[in-house]
Amino acid sequence: MLGRAQRTLKRKVCYSGVGVHFGKPAMLTLEPAEENTGVVFSRHAASGQYIPARLANVCGTGRSTTLSSQGGVVSTVEHLLAALYSCGVDNVRIHCSEDEIPIGDGSSQVFVDLIDQAGVEEQGQTVPIARLTHPVYYQHQDTILAAFPSEEFKISYTLHYSHNSAIGTQYRSQVISEESFRKEIAPCRTFALYNELCFLMERGLIGGGCLGNAVLFKDDSVISLGKLRFPDEPVRHKMLDLIGDLSLIGKPFLAHIIAVGSGHSSNIALGNKILEALQYEQELVK
């Protein structure tokens, strides 16, 4: 089985910002963690409210991914998780002063910068890299997700917004490595359609949303601070979300993920199918 040394941060780092949905200022702290800890969130450390970043702890997928365990809740975790997973950080303790991770500029860039500020170091234990050996599928209405055996971690994503010509149909296929994530995926911001804003606000969401942390699409126009960072920034951000959600499998793995119009709910559904397949394969090896 493939493997590499486990990795953690060299030092503690902090970041303060606003949550995109609830609009509350929050302090985020990332700390080094011991081998085999995994990625663990805490809301109130003194009361023991620890939330491992695992699929079993997903409690919500409405416009973001929310985790809950031992009475603690933390939401909008996917951008931070995508950065940690892609930068190979296996063990880290994350404390957030509020229920929602700060949004930064709507991408993973602020979290990649935090990881660089902290530095990363190898640990003594190894982490196995799992390899999918048979395909798994998930489909719901027009959403299709599949994972196929591969020698690399690759995502091929199709985004189709027939009702918005500024987005239209976008396709991107890319091997995800730390280098490609940093250059091609991490800077890509979350986005919304202009005609969705009232609906989202009525649901108590995007209370902290602004043009500093999201891109708006209205009909055939783009409303953004500056130009799009890539012509296909929306589909790249969808890939970012998918990476963050699949990191909740809890171990690095190799597969070719094919996605058509997926969101957080379907990402998590595929993640559970991949995890089940990997666990089954592990049992066969014993």
From Swiss-Prot:
The active site is at H264. Pfam families: LpxC. It is an enzyme of class 3 (hydrolase). The keyword Hydrolase applies. GO terms for molecular function: metal ion binding; UDP-3-O-acyl-N-acetylglucosamine deacetylase activity. Pathway: Glycolipid biosynthesis; lipid IV(A) biosynthesis; lipid IV(A) from (3R)-3-hydroxytetradecanoyl-[acyl-carrier-protein] and UDP-N-acetyl-alpha-D-glucosamine: step 2/6. GO terms for biological process: lipid A biosynthetic process. Zn(2+) binds at H79, H237, D241. One of its GO terms (cellular component) is membrane. Its cofactor is Zn(2+). It catalyses: a UDP-3-O-[(3R)-3-hydroxyacyl]-N-acetyl-alpha-D-glucosamine + H2O = a UDP-3-O-[(3R)-3-hydroxyacyl]-alpha-D-glucosamine + acetate. SUPFAM superfamilies: Ribosomal protein S5 domain 2-like. Catalyzes the hydrolysis of UDP-3-O-myristoyl-N-acetylglucosamine to form UDP-3-O-myristoylglucosamine and acetate, the committed step in lipid A biosynthesis. This is UDP-3-O-acyl-N-acetylglucosamine deacetylase.
